[in-house]
Curated annotation (Swiss-Prot):
This is Thymidylate synthase. It comes from the Bacteria. It comes from Marinobacter nauticus (strain ATCC 700491 / DSM 11845 / VT8). (6R)-5,10-methylene-5,6,7,8-tetrahydrofolate binds at H51, D182, A278. Its EC number is 2.1.1.45. Catalyzes the reductive methylation of 2'-deoxyuridine-5'-monophosphate (dUMP) to 2'-deoxythymidine-5'-monophosphate (dTMP) while utilizing 5,10-methylenetetrahydrofolate (mTHF) as the methyl donor and reductant in the reaction, yielding dihydrofolate (DHF) as a by-product. This enzymatic reaction provides an intracellular de novo source of dTMP, an essential precursor for DNA biosynthesis.
């Protein structure tokens, strides 16, 4: 995962100091990319321990089409707690857009099912795309996430907003476009989540895995993470060997996976580094 540390160092060295929605402030760069050959190991950050249960459960939650934080909370996953209503509602975020995109003519599109069918039947298509960016349901930045949900909008605009698949030589690759990237807290989750999704869809489509390509718009470090015990502590650490992902069974569909289906052999990270969340 040297590419991840190199990007973090790039932001430290070359970033612009900017204000942001949260009021914390960031140092950011624009237009960067990382590439991971999934044949070389699973791209899980090793310079700090990453909470795998949260990553897996969140992805399964997206795939369920759920926008109810209660499902995550019942599994002791707290990553969405700050933005949800008391009843768990988060508005039409990722799960709804992936599984139930509402069209003006009344149709509802299950983008995940459609893209898997296209990978199977039209692997050379250049339209193997899933988008979470629905301008009609984006939040109003002048009010709170909770008030947005009450008005039928997303609690948060999607940060990882569009991904595309590519099939060649019997391998499935994925490119993610992430408009806004919290490099310290969010990006390790995002890398692992989309790499895992690529493995899952490849298995469902009887393909090997190729590359995961992670493309960024605004890639930033929050100012309160630019401290000796957070960002600079991570930069001092040496990356370790990547783990190997083992998927223990093949469910009948992409929607049948469970937490216990995934094992990450050889994951030996450095200790966790805690950091505050910008809300």
């Amino acid at each position: 995962m040297k590419a991840y540390l190199d990007l973090m160092q790039d932001v430290v060295d070359n970033g612009f100091d900017k204000g942001d929605r949260t009021g914390v402030g960031t140092r950011s760069v624009f237009g960067r990319q990382m590439r991971f050959n999934l044949q070389d190991g699973f791209p899980l950050v090793t310079t700090k321990k990453v909470h795998l249960r949260s990553i897996i459960y969140e992805l399964l939650w997206f795939l369920k089409g759920s926008t109810d934080n209660t499902w995550l909370a019942e599994r002791k996953v707290s990553i969405w707690n700050e933005w949800a209503l008391e009843n768990g509602d988060l508005g039409p975020i990722y799960g709804k857009q992936w599984r139930s995109w509402q069209c003006h003519d009344g149709r509802v599109i299950d983008q995940i099912s459609e893209v898997i069918e296209q990978i199977r039947t039209k692997p050379n298509s250049r339209r193997l795309i899933v988008s979470a960016w629905n301008p009609a349901e984006l939040p109003d930045e002048s009010i709170s996430p909770q008030d947005n949900v009450r008005e039928g909008r997303m609690a948060l605009a999607p940060c990882h907003c569009l991904f595309q698949f590519y099939v060649a030589d019997g391998k499935l690759s994925c490119q993610l476009y992430q408009r806004s990237a919290d490099l310290f807290l969010g990006v390790p989750f995002n890398i692992a989540s989309y790499a895992l999704l690529t493995h899952m869809i490849a298995q469902q489509c009887d393909l090997d895995v190729g590359e995961f390509v992670h493309t960024f718009g605004d890639c930033h470090l929050y100012r309160n993470h630019l401290t000796d015990d957070i960002v600079f502590e991570q930069l001092r650490r040496e990356p370790r060997a990547l783990p190997k992902l083992v998927i223990k069974r093949k469910p009948e569909s992409i929607f049948g996976y469970e937490l216990e289906d995934f094992e990450f052999e050889g994951y030996d990270p450095s200790p966790v580094i805690k950091a505050p969340i910008a809300i």
